[in-house]
């Protein structure tokens, strides 16, 4: 079987494993939590905010906190599908290049993160619109720059590739959840507290 066909098969198998795990639940809950926060935060105030501020607030929460934590949990779940049943020996004995095993997992994780970004955009728009409908005084003002918002989320997604690579390597390297979770939580903490520092730009 040609290598492209083998990789497609490995990718399909990995996607099937994801559907049977909690990864899809995580992919739905993380963006939903941000949308719920945006919704109730808008209802809490008495003054309308521009669309740009509302959308940038959603993107900031996603980039600084929810995305790193989601990637940490997602990569741990993906790795646990093999670590749990101790299936690595069987997988590595299969007649296909080993890089297919790892690349298919990376592609699936990136695909889920991309889907989460799209879902975040949709839910944020619905949350802001719904808050304005329930409380007209806080209805977002100004132009709704959806293209700019999607571009921002796309740039955040591209910047997250390094984060995915690091977290997935750690999750695959160690059978325990602890190292991957420790690095993910620690990295998120330092990225948040070092936002205003010069070193903050070096933290994925």
What are these regions (language model features)?
Residues 1-28:
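Aromatic- and glycine-rich beta-strand/loop motifs that create alpha-glucan
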Residues 14, 18, 92, 165-175, ...:
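Generic transmembrane alpha-helix motif of multi-pass integral membrane proteins
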Residues 27-31, 105-106, 184-185:
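Residue-level recognition of transmembrane alpha-helices
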Residues 32-71, 75, 103, 107-174:
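Secretory targeting signals
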Residues 38-41, 174-204:
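Transmembrane helix segments
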Residues 73-92:
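Transmembrane helix boundary and interhelical loop/hinge segments in multi-pass membrane proteins
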Residues 92-98:
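Short helix-to-coil transition segments within interhelical loops
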